[in-house]
């Protein structure tokens, strides 16, 4: 029996398989993209805080209100500042105040338009069954420039 020659497609597939086997396996280190190192100045880093021991942290005072941030700041002591305090009553009052506001009603111009008045007269003549040959309407408009 005669052996069949491999077709062109089969040859291409065999070559693809050989090429895939030749490629090295990707490593995690090669896959991670290296970010460029950025030089940060002291101004960008912010203020350097002094090192404190646990005892110093425990001996610190109660937090001050945020309004006293620049007034009560001690250079050799840890100063803690808290945000503004809102009691339940304050929040309820705000909600009640907002709910008590009346809805805004749009103001409608009550004066009738001249064109509407003219159209009303024309239609009343037509509805009344008067002679339509007597009705002649000419409308011209000019846009302001």
From Swiss-Prot:
Residue span of region Disordered: 1-61
Ranges annotated as biased composition (Basic and acidic residues): 1-18
This protein's name: Uncharacterized protein C02F5.10
Classification lineage: Eukaryota, Metazoa, Ecdysozoa, Nematoda, Chromadorea
